[in-house]
């Protein structure tokens, strides 16, 4: 399975700096001279190991070690068969019969069959599962009707032909079908890993996986350790163990790397990038990600579009990039990052340009107009919410100063640790809140669809019928140029009404010990670790 920061279409939540938890006395394998154990870092406990429920990058990173899907993305960004042996497609591209590789097994030694895929996919679509990712399967015939209670499970276009073949019927042809099916959403599941309450078992003795690793130990808020799956089909995987240590502070993680307690550091402190960028251990990877602050348009004062736009124009993104990110990011004046291109070479972002800018005079003017429209003599109190991550705190404090200086508005700041913050965000319990959206499918629709109508990720509560119609039409449009034109119109509408403040398009920084090889860095994804080797 390709490693996603969680998958594209559902577009996962991206994190600025990934770090590690309570300090262990054990040195990393590189420091000890061992060749079979990798120690790296993540910023928080995984929210879940259930791909049907996961929407954050940390969960996706760990899930990617434990489970494999039909296809995977290689280091060149191309999609290769993983559990799929071959596929047959009908004339109009609406039926795929996917044949599985022979002798692929679960970690308990039992065979992986087409029934396991059918079970997992229909479980995700089952309304009782409560998956916020179900819309990403709506390209499958009958999936939306079943998920919304308007159809039956038996009408869903997922059919077992025989134990080694799965037939998938689509609502319409999909050009990026392998990209979609490479997602962690489309993994199989063993029924033995699901309890009587339809929950995924997370006890290492009970969780049956099919990826390169199995769960060995999970010490919440300390570390999660995976070990080599002896039943995994790909014998090129030789790494015996990966320990993901959990610390939300990137400086602490950096110190652990420097003291040889980490082999791979994910997320350098911004102030260390300049120092390390000439280091041979330094790696920088582009990300198809957008860091934003989202408005809840149902909460005052952000019920007014002019007020929302005023807050966006009051943000000095150049300062944030230069001073806080040390130029390790790109200023974001739109929502869709660079990198989404047609086969003919059209770059979605470059050909359209910017939607917003830093303009304090215009910001003040719009704020006054918006307040007048609402009949407000004073602006309702505003609280900006963010996570406990050190870098997020710096950005939030900078924005607090910008709103004071450029709008004359005092705002409050409130932060929470990541797992609690996700719950707050999903409940739309905010006026203005940080979020990062990433994914490895370089397609503008993966960003714009987040704000579509009644979609599960539209936490901003923003609705525009014309925007929704354009996004819906783009989902089925097969002509790339026409599709880009539709999505440009959709983004035009988005920034006319401003449901979000774009801040930066980030890149991701790593330090990798010279003794470590085989890490694959893929645009928009977490690192691929299965082929890691460590010199003794």
Residue map of PLM features:
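N-terminal lobe/hinge region of extracytoplasmic solute-binding protein
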Residues: 41-91, 208
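Surface-exposed binding/hinge segments that line
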Residues: 88, 118, 132-191
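Gly/Pro-rich hinge or "lid" segments in bacterial periplasmic/extracellular proteins
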Residues: 164, 170-237, 241, 251
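Ligand/substrate-recognition segments at binding pockets and active sites
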Residues: 368-439, 508
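Detector for C-terminal structural segments
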Residues: 314-344, 391-400, 424-536
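Structural transition elements
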Residues: 331-370, 391-393
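Aromatic- and charge-enriched surface segment that lines or borders ligand/interaction sites
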Residues: 85-133, 167, 301
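Ligand-site clamp/hinge motif
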Residues: 229-274
């Amino acid at each position: 399975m390709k490693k996603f920061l969680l998958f594209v279409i559902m577009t996962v939540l991206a994190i600025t700096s990934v770090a590690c938890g309570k300090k262990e006395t054990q040195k990393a394998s590189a420091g000890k001279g061992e060749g079979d154990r990798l120690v790296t870092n993540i910023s928080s406990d995984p929210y879940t190991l259930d791909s049907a429920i996961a929407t954050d990058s940390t969960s996706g990173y760990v899930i990617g070690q434990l489970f494999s899907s039909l296809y995977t993305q290689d280091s060149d960004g191309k999609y290769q068969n993983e559990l799929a042996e071959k596929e047959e497609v009908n004339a109009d591209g609406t039926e795929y019969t996917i044949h599985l590789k022979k002798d692929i097994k679960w970690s308990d030694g039992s065979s992986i069959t087409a029934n396991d895929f059918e079970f997992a996919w229909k479980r995700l679509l089952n309304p009782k599962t409560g998956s916020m990712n179900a819309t990403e399967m709506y390209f499958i015939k009958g999936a939306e009707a079943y998920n919304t209670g308007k159809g039956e499970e038996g009408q869903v276009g997922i059919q077992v032909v025989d134990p080694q073949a799965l037939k998938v019927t689509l609502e319409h042809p999909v050009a990026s079908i392998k990209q979609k099916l490479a997602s962690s959403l489309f993994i199989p599941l063993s029924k033995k890993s699901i309890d009587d309450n339809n929950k995924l078992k997370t006890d290492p003795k009970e969780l049956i996986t099919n990826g390169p690793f199995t769960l060995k130990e999970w010490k919440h808020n300390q570390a999660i350790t995976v070990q080599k799956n002896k039943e995994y089909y790909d014998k090129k995987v030789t790494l015996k163990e990966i320990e993901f240590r959990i610390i939300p502070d990137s400086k602490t993680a950096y110190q652990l790397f420097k003291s040889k307690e980490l082999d791979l550091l994910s997320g350098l402190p911004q102030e260390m990038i300049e120092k390390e960028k000439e280091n041979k251990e330094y790696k920088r990877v582009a990300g198809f990600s957008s860091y934003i602050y989202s408005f809840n348009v149902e909460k005052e004062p952000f019920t007014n579009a002019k007020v929302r736009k005023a807050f966006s124009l009051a943000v000095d993104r150049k300062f944030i990039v230069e001073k806080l990110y040390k130029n390790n990011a790109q200023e974001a004046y739109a929502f869709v990052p660079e990198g989404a291109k047609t086969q003919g070479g059209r770059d979605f972002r470059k050909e359209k340009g910017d939607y917003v800018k830093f303009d304090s005079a215009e910001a003040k003017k719009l704020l006054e107009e918006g307040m007048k429209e609402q009949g407000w003599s004073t602006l309702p109190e505003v609280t900006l919410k963010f996570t406990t991550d050190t870098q997020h705190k710096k950005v939030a404090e900078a924005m607090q100063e910008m709103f004071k200086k450029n709008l004359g508005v005092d705002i409050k700041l409130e932060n929470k640790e990541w797992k609690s913050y996700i719950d707050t965000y999903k409940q739309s319990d905010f006026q203005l809140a940080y979020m990062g959206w990433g994914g490895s499918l370089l397609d503008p629709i993966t960003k714009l669809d987040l704000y579509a109508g009644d979609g599960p990720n539209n936490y901003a509560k923003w609705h525009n019928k014309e925007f929704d119609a354009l996004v819906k039409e783009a989902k089925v449009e097969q002509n790339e140029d026409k599709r880009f034109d539709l999505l440009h119109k959709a983004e035009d509408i988005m920034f006319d009404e401003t449901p979000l403040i774009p801040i930066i398009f980030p890149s991701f920084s790593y330090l990798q010990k010279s003794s470590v090889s085989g890490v694959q860095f893929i645009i928009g994804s977490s690192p691929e670790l299965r082929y890691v080797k460590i010199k003794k």
